[in-house]
């Protein structure tokens, strides 16, 4: 089973530079995990996430977006509404660092050259490369085996606004479809575990 990572960006702030074509900002939010271990609630951040982002605004409707985000994924079967998971009792913690690039599309013109207040909903998708701990579960506790990396597809929706000349603030919610089945340690790729 592939995993969905839910990322909620509570706040990201951008400061416009170079004639309002480039944006550089910080990202503060929360993260939660959906997979084989723990609860299955899609939007329930239980750990903080931070990052930086850069946008190159090609037009009032789209921009190229590059970001770095890091956070910790934690989940416990005891927090699940599924009785079989409660009985199993697995838990894990995994550190994740993500590099992402993609296209952000604004549903309304978001022209940073215009001095008027601007607000627009948007969608974002692209490709992410992330580094995580390859873990395994032994005795209902996760253990780090080695560090690994893979790709993911981020998909996000949000709303942003510019209320001051050089300041953009927004909120978004999204998830990542990952190409690994072992963020939670339930499917280790270590040869020592094969029979």
Regions found by a protein language model. Name each.
Residues 60-62, 66-138:
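Gram-negative (and chloroplast) outer-membrane scaffold detector with strong preference
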Residues 34-40, 84-93, 140-145, 194:
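Extracellular loop and loop/strand-boundary signature of outer-membrane beta-barrel proteins
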Residues 20, 44-48, 95-99, 117-119, ...:
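Residues that define the transmembrane beta-barrel architecture of outer-membrane proteins
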Residues 18-57:
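Short glycine/proline- and aromatic-enriched beta-strand/turn motifs that initiate or cap beta-hairpins
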Residues 26, 52-56, 101-105, 125-129, ...:
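Residues on the lipid-exposed face of transmembrane beta-strands in outer-membrane beta-barrel proteins
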Residues 78, 163-195:
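Predominantly the C-terminal beta-signal and adjacent terminal strand-loop region
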Residues 1-26:
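Bacterial Sec-dependent N-terminal signal peptides
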Residues 22, 60-64, 166-169:
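Repeated loop/turn-to-beta-strand initiation elements of outer-membrane beta-barrel proteins
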């Amino acid at each position: 089973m592939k995993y969905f990572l839910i990322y909620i960006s509570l706040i990201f702030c951008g400061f416009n530079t170079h004639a309002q074509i480039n944006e550089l900002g910080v990202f503060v939010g929360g993260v939660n995990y959906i997979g084989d271990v723990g609860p299955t609630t899609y939007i329930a951040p239980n750990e903080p996430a931070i990052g930086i982002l850069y946008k190159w605004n090609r037009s009032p409707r789209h921009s190229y977006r590059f970001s770095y985000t890091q956070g910790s994924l934690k989940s416990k079967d005891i927090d699940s509404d599924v009785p079989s998971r409660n009985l199993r009792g697995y838990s894990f913690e995994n550190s994740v660092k993500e590099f992402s690039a993609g296209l952000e599309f604004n549903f309304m013109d978001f022209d940073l050259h215009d001095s008027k207040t601007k607000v627009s909903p948007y969608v974002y998708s692209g490709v992410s490369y992330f580094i995580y701990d390859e873990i395994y579960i032994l005795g209902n506790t996760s253990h780090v085996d080695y560090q690994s990396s893979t790709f993911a597809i981020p998909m996000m929706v949000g709303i942003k606004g510019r209320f001051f000349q050089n300041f953009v603030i927004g909120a978004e919610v999204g998830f990542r479809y990952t190409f690994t089945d072992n963020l939670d340690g339930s499917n280790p790729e270590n040869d020592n575990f094969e029979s």
